[in-house]
């Protein structure tokens, strides 16, 4: 998917002076090249404005947390996102603050190449009524409260009982989110082009429940079983809802996903190596040996 860079909407991390200053520099840079640009400080409580909905690209200035927050607001808009990293890890926000002019020059000259990403929709049903729902770009996590107690969950796929789980929690992650909380809990790395999602238990107790990958077309069901524990569901590590025994959490692939701008010279595998997810003891960047 290829697009021309004509209009840019810039979203900055909240209360971040460096992001605001960089956004002003970017606006001037784009204006000098005949590219329309507008700026907004990230506001999670509101929808993206009309300018963003008609933009060629949404630039996000911040870390991966800001990138996730803006990504949820952009699900289904058909407008690609590109992050400029002002945080620590920067797996989602790929462009460095020092290298933005070089990256954007190439995009202005060559246009945008976009990749599609899957998002998750989840809903909490209580006594047959939906009491909470949301969208996640990275993950939906069920976890315990302030006390160090395992939580009791009943799991199912497409209406078929899978098994019960006693654990500190459970992570349902998209391919995009596979490099986040899920990989720390022993979950699989999943290429972002795949239309699947992963289920990863957090410290399962006396249970041989291994991480698994489900097709995006499947429905994953989590029943909160009786127990003394507090249980919460959190989307992308940013919004939380308290659950009760008997609640049913249903997770499916969202009807529409989102788009990310592909950065020239940055592949999924180069990012895995650069961020330490994959180690290369023989020397970074060596070619794969040719088959004989």
Swiss-Prot record:
| InterPro entries in the cross-refs | ATP-NAD_kinase_N, ATP-NAD_kinase_PpnK-typ_C, NAD/diacylglycerol_kinase_sf, NADK
Q: Which Pfam families match?
A: NAD_kinase, NAD_kinase_C
Gene Ontology BP term (one): NAD metabolic process
Q: Where in the cell is it found?
A: Cytoplasm
Which function does this protein serve?
Involved in the regulation of the intracellular balance of NAD and NADP, and is a key enzyme in the biosynthesis of NADP. Catalyzes specifically the phosphorylation on 2'-hydroxyl of the adenosine moiety of NAD to yield NADP.
Q: Which PANTHER family match?
A: NAD KINASE
Q: Which family is this sequence assigned to? A: Belongs to the NAD kinase family.
Q: What is this protein called?
A: NAD kinase
Q: Which organism is it from?
A: Oleidesulfovibrio alaskensis (strain ATCC BAA-1058 / DSM 17464 / G20) (Desulfovibrio alaskensis)
């Amino acid at each position: 998917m290829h697009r021309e860079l004509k209009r840019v909407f810039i979203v900055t991390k909240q209360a971040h002076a460096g992001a605001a200053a960089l956004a002003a520099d970017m606006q001037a840079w784009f204006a000098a090249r005949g590219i329309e640009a507008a700026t907004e400080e990230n506001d999670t409580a509101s929808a993206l404005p009309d300018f963003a909905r008609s933009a060629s690209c949404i630039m996000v200035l911040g870390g991966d947390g800001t990138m996730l927050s803006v990504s949820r607001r952009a699900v289904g808009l058909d407008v690609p996102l590109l992050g400029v990293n002002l945080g620590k890890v920067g797996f989602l926000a790929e462009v460095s603050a020092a290298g933005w002019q070089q990256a954007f020059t190439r995009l202005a000259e060559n246009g945008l190449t976009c990749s599609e990403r899957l998002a998750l929709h989840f809903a909490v049903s209580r006594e047959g009524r939906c009491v909470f729902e949301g969208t996640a770009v990275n993950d939906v996590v069920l976890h315990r409260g302030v006390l160090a107690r395992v939580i009791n969950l009943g799991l199912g796929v497409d209406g078929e009982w899978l098994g019960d789980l006693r654990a500190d929690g459970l992570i349902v992650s998209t391919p995009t989110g596979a490099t986040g909380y899920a990989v720390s809990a022993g979950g699989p790395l999943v290429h972002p082009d795949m239309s699947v999602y992963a289920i990863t238990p957090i410290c399962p107790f006396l249970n041989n429940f291994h991480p698994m990958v489900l097709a995006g077309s499947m429905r994953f069901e989590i029943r909160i079983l009786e127990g003394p524990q507090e249980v919460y569901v959190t989307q992308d590590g940013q919004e939380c809802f308290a659950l009760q025994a008997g609640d049913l959490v249903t997770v499916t692939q969202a009807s529409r996903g989102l788009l990310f701008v592909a950065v020239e010279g940055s592949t999924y595998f180069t990012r895995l190596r650069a961020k330490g997810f994959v180690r290369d003891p023989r020397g970074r960047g060596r070619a794969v040996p040719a088959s004989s």
